[in-house]
Amino acid sequence: MAFLALGINHKTASVDVRERVAFTPEQLVEALQQLCRLTDSREAAILSTCNRSELYIEQDQLSADIVLRWLADYHHLSLDELRASAYVHEDDAAVRHMMRVASGLDSLVLGEPQILGQMKSAYAVAREAGTIGPLLGRLFQATFNAAKQVRTDTAIGENPVSVAFAAVSLAKQIFSDLQRSQALLIGAGETITLVARHLHELGVKRIVVANRTLERASLLAEQFGAHAVLLSDIPAELVRSDIVISSTASQLPILGKGAVESALKLRKHKPIFMVDIAVPRDIEPEVGELDDVYLYSVDDLHEVVAENLKSRQGAAQAAEEMVSVGADDFMVRLRELAAVDVLKAYRQQSERLRDEELQKALRLLANGGNAEDVLGQLARGLTNKLLHAPSVQLKKLSAEGRLDALAMAQELFALEGSPDSFSDKKPQ
């Protein structure tokens, strides 16, 4: 039994590398099944977000190199390139890492709540793929409990901060009066929903939601009095938009330099503020070369995020302590489980010996045997049978000079004295 947590995140890899190592939702089930099949992993789950791609694995023997090689091959990267950005956590450290991630302690925005939902989605997909078993299943449940405790018992979730909030904060810095600004939001997922909520609360003049399907865009738009359009309508909406924030699951860019350049001409070069939160990127990096465009990627949000971290450092320290306790408790319970099969077998063996001696005693009583004598014989017979196998093994270990094993037996049977005291005795 061994746990692995390995992958890359916003702290170790550039957005370019994260794009190439990201898994699409459609890939996950097949990728999980292939991962288990090709790396001798008994259980596995994959967490893939715009800021991280991580594998959580349970194996008989740790083989991080094999898993890293699989990840590199799957995404057509060189192993050296992946190693340069990857991290590996094993056993206790892997458990602690998972709990830190789910609690928002390892996020770009400290304490952001979305990561717990993403972790739950990773668990659900792994169950669908059939790659979650009893051990990873227990670890995920312990992880969810730890994250819930952190969220409930610390102030880390107060004054909610997220990548979405950071994007809107940047917009506020550039446009002094958002109530006169128009915003185009591309996508209709959780991040864009948060962006829409923040912009709506700030009284942005007009919000447009563009999505691949009009139905999904409309569902989001209705919540905030926004307008819904298709992706094909983006060029027309760009002309009217002062703020563009994009976060889709598209594998290809949604916005190119040419389209933005055309919109700027029609806007008479009135500036456009753009934030690309997606991985892979929705907006071609070359768009940032245009004079009247302020283009930010997720990696550019670090400065904004840093300001919001200050108020959360005290809460983070308390959260770290909770995570450490949760991880330690989980590993203790897990190691206790390792003894269950041995204890079960020992109990079954003891009950079989008890039943044999009991049947013998009942036969003696049925034949008129003295009850006191029969009970004494039952007690002696049961004692001898229960002690026979341990006695044989202890004598063998003693003959081999295995004082460590004798000390363990002494602890196991709660005996007084030290096995060392016998080592100085010489035969008479």
UniProtKB/Swiss-Prot annotation:
Documented EC number(s): 1.2.1.70
A Pfam short name: GlutR_N
Positions with a binding annotation for NADP(+): G187, A188, G189, E190, T191, I192
The protein's annotated pathway: Porphyrin-containing compound metabolism; protoporphyrin-IX biosynthesis; 5-aminolevulinate from L-glutamyl-tRNA(Glu): step 1/2
Superkingdom per UniProt: Bacteria
Entry-linked InterPro entries: 4pyrrol_synth_GluRdtase, 4pyrrol_synth_GluRdtase_dimer, 4pyrrol_synth_GluRdtase_N, GluRdtase_CS, GluRdtase_dimer_dom_sf, GluRdtase_N_sf, NAD(P)-bd_dom_sf, Shikm_DH/Glu-tRNA_Rdtase
GO MF annotation: an example: NADP binding
Presence of the UniProt keyword Chloroplast in the record: no
Keyword match Cell inner membrane: no
Note on domains (UniProt): Possesses an unusual extended V-shaped dimeric structure with each monomer consisting of three distinct domains arranged along a curved 'spinal' alpha-helix. The N-terminal catalytic domain specifically recognizes the glutamate moiety of the substrate. The second domain is the NADPH-binding domain, and the third C-terminal domain is responsible for dimerization.
Subunit organization: Homodimer.
Family according to the record: Belongs to the glutamyl-tRNA reductase family.
Miscellaneous remark of the record: During catalysis, the active site Cys acts as a nucleophile attacking the alpha-carbonyl group of tRNA-bound glutamate with the formation of a thioester intermediate between enzyme and glutamate, and the concomitant release of tRNA(Glu). The thioester intermediate is finally reduced by direct hydride transfer from NADPH, to form the product GSA.
Name of the molecule in the record: Glutamyl-tRNA reductase
Species per Swiss-Prot/TrEMBL record: Pseudomonas fluorescens (strain Pf0-1)
